């Protein structure tokens, strides 16, 4: 990725954004060697590498060999799955990593996908120890962001903490990632259709903070990703590189803005609701991006088929006109599904009960203090009903 070009765009925009957090981003074959060279410059000892048994085999072992060749002394911490076989970013995982961090620790290294990065990001932010990102799958857009979604006492909360100081993604490693993780990464990108929509709605109707540059960066990443969906589905080197760079751009956009609005709207709220229900019931977790792929279709269809015909009930004429134009510009939900399927996504990856879908459409907007069209619709129609009831009683 061309960080210099991105910095130039940021300067030219003259927008009041957060500084670009990463010193270096490499997405290429042989990136693990470059990662070892970077880490060696940061610290010759006091390096803690965090992975699980799968990501250690995927990239950790080779990275460790490269570090040894550079004379770097590094300790490993392998995260343990729960009874369902899932690595969860919860109190147990956080404490296990915290116990590996000592006063002499200079650098943390996250070797894995989204959850491992969430755990390391949280520990990095709380201990003031920088971390380096080594993604093993192009599965989520959170690698370069500031946010760490953490499960605390069964509920998920996102903590705004720190981005990695550098990221190295080896395309050979990415190509060998499980196909479901690659499909999930594409699902996370497809979610930008509705997240960008909801962010625009919040800005227009509720005066929420907005950035044209951040929106443009996110939209460009989405378009580039969609254009290469065939290559992504075939897991070509070019395909996984485009997907990884699109996900990273989305994460950087969030970091520049300081919040997740560009990449997380009602579609993510539905996904989080489903995840919390699975945690409550002790069920195995589903892939985040796979859920977002489904929730994007659901929320898109809900906006077009349910909200749009009812929009004048809770918005004035000028607001309704703006919302109608934006909803009509959203892609057809069936077209979104076709794109996802090209990337390897299928509904079997997300066996969500229809009852849970309906429940999430009713209540998921309450999970975040953020305006989305789903929130405006639920709150607006509720107020309308209450007002009508009051008139009826008077």
Swiss-Prot record:
Residues bound to NAD(+): 52, 114-118, 136-139, 145
UniProt-annotated binding residues for substrate: 141, 188, 272
Example of a GO biological process term: glycerophospholipid metabolic process
Keyword Lipid biosynthesis on entry: yes
Required co-factors: Ni(2+)
The protein's Enzyme Commission number: 1.1.1.261
Binding positions for Ni(2+) per the UniProt entry: 188, 268, 288
Keyword Glycosyltransferase attached: no
Co-factor remark: Binds 1 nickel ion per subunit.
Origin: domain of life: Bacteria
Signal peptide: none
Record's catalysed reaction(s): sn-glycerol 1-phosphate + NAD(+) = dihydroxyacetone phosphate + NADH + H(+); sn-glycerol 1-phosphate + NADP(+) = dihydroxyacetone phosphate + NADPH + H(+)
GO molecular function term, any single one: metal ion binding
Alphabetical keyword list: Cytoplasm, Lipid biosynthesis, Lipid metabolism, Metal-binding, NAD, NADP, Nickel, Oxidoreductase, Phospholipid biosynthesis, Phospholipid metabolism
Subunit structure comment from the entry: Homodimer.
PANTHER family: GLYCEROL DEHYDROGENASE, GLYCEROL DEHYDROGENASE 1
Family note: Belongs to the glycerol-1-phosphate dehydrogenase family.
Described purpose of this protein according to its UniProt entry: Catalyzes the NAD(P)H-dependent reduction of dihydroxyacetonephosphate (DHAP or glycerone phosphate) to glycerol 1-phosphate (G1P). The G1P thus generated is probably used for the synthesis of phosphoglycerolipids in Gram-positive bacterial species.
Name of the protein: Glycerol-1-phosphate dehydrogenase [NAD(P)+]
Natural source organism: Shouchella clausii (strain KSM-K16)
